[in-house]
Amino acid sequence: MTKKIIAKKIIALVGRPNVGKSTLFNRLSMRKKAIVHDLPGVTRDRKYTDGRIGSFEFSLIDTPGLEENPDSFGKRLMEQTTKAINEADLICFMVDSRSGILPDDKLLSDFVRKYNKPAVLVINKCEKAFDFDKEYYKLGFDSMVAISAEHGTGMIDLYDEIIAKLPEEDSAEAEIHDPIKGDCLQIVVSGRPNAGKSTFINALINDERLLTGPEAGITRESIEIDWQYKGNHIKLIDTAGLRKKATITESLEKLSASDAINSIKFANTVILMIDALSPLKQQDLNIASHVANEGRSIVIVVNKWDLIKESEKEAFKEEFYYQINTTLPQVKGVPALFISAKNKQNIADVLDSCIKIYKTWNKKITTSKLNEWLNFTTEAHPLPLQKGGKRVRVKYMTQTKTRPPTFKLFSNNPEKITDSYTRYLVNNMREAFDMPGVPIRFNYIKTKNPYV
């Protein structure tokens, strides 16, 4: 008889560094959501996804590798894993068959078993036939399975062991976890290292969900967090700090940077986090320009505002706005907020701005209003006459898409329309239709009517 598992269960992958937790995480989620690298300790935060083996669906947590590390950083990693263990219905405790059982494995298995959670010992990197040596039984788990996360072998055995460990439920009593319906606003938090991105997200959700500290570059992977704000389904995505390309030499940092850039590509809104103590470097402008080129909406947030002297704040803002508006014309009018993530000062305003600019990013303007505006704007400032006395005209336009707002404009000679005239039209449109801070795209089409 098939066992009845009604509620969606939570499974945590736990073990010392480099035993293959992130590889199994990617395997079970059927997507490459975790960075995998030979360097131990790549994962530093709890990472969540939906997992599946056959028809069995569950929530999956990847955790930092645990070591007997007494320093402050190691303790913060341990806190992340402890929270995952507390959340989980079942623990997959992972070890590496190639290295065998190490002292850390024994210490950590004792730590995990203290929580009295259902657990399966997962012996990874078993590419060949495997005999369970008595040393594995010394870890104290009564259920174990040999797998190769990299090659996908042993997944059916893993399924059997997991199902056997989970209690059977009555459908009337089981809690059913339905996905949140409606649009999900995906907000990526990006910026240079140590700008306070993770601290900001922790402050928003009121939970030490992400590892933070004074060390630059703690976050290595994009971490997704589902959240509700004022009835809106929000997916917050923390990303690794982005340094200049020329300063990135290690392969792991290249993977982290690529992961962060990829997150921007699929975002609805990007929060560009800037350190008030190191304001507006060229790299900040490069990130903002990349966001605009990808067609994403953007909100600029200056963090650590509490560390700026009151007497200097007005001059700081004046200079900041000047630089933004002169160097980022493609998102002119972008909202900028000044916060202290550490003190939770003005952090709710950031989400309100994200929701507002998201609506602008989705704005649809009727064709009649567009052409009324176009006629007025081009008559007020027409294009210059060409040779032969013929004037270039833009006679008609329509909106072809949103996200970002994109428009098709029909002209008798589109190749003669200058970039400066396009900027004039775009800036005028921003003011006329209240569209600050979002990329606006114009595509010119040559009209087939010779009399236009």
From Swiss-Prot:
Q: Pfam families, from UniProt?
A: KH_dom-like (PF14714), MMR_HSR1 (PF01926)
What are the GO BP annotations of this UniProt entry? ribosome biogenesis
Question: What is the protein named?
Answer: GTPase Der
Gene name per UniProt: der
Which InterPro entries does this chain map to? G_ENGA, GTP-bd, GTPase_Der, KH_dom-like, KH_dom-like_a/b, P-loop_NTPase, Small_GTP-bd
Q: Give start and end of each EngA-type G domain.
A: 9-170, 185-362
Which positions does UniProt annotate for GTP 1 binding? 15-22, 62-66, 124-127
Primary role: GTPase that plays an essential role in the late steps of ribosome biogenesis.
Q: Which residues bind GTP 2?
A: 191-198, 238-242, 303-306
